[in-house]
């Protein structure tokens, strides 16, 4: 079995959630090496290499930004796997185009980046976070299995 490391970049109040889910298992350091929590746009730009134009053109909650976050964290960590997550957990902050419960995901796996958007709805901040963690874990397993 090939050993892989997972690298995460998150801006949706998930920093503790995704990492917490992984580190709750013994020997988590065998798969998790680094995680960035980049709430500020400047942090996404400085640490992950997200382009300011991408944020300006698409908004921070977008598949385009999640894409660049996933690629950025993988690049910084020199990894084959990177995950980027950005969204609106609520209770406020949503708009008609980007409502509360909308979360965008980027997955960089072995040189290929794919993105997804989930609209969990106004199910409460903690449930949006929980649903996002579940999505990340399930999708990672699926993509790594391919």
Model-derived regions: residue spans:
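Short alpha-helical segments enriched in small residues
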Residues: 1-146
């Amino acid at each position: 079995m090939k050993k892989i490391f997972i690298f995460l970049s998150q801006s949706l109040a998930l920093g503790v959630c995704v990492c917490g889910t992984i580190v709750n298992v013994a020997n988590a350091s065998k798969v998790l090496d680094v995680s960035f929590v980049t709430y500020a746009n400047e942090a996404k730009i400085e640490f992950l290499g997200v382009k300011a134009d991408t944020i300006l053109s698409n908004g921070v909650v977008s598949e385009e930004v999640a894409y660049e976050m996933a690629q950025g964290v993988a690049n910084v960590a020199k990894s084959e796997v990177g995950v980027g997550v950005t969204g609106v957990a609520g209770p406020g902050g949503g708009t008609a185009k980007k409502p509360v419960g909308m979360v965008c995901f980027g997955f960089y796996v072995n040189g290929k980046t794919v993105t997804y958007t989930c609209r969990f709805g106004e199910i409460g901040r903690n449930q949006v976070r929980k649903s996002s963690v579940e999505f990340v874990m399930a999708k990672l397993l699926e993509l790594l299995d391919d």
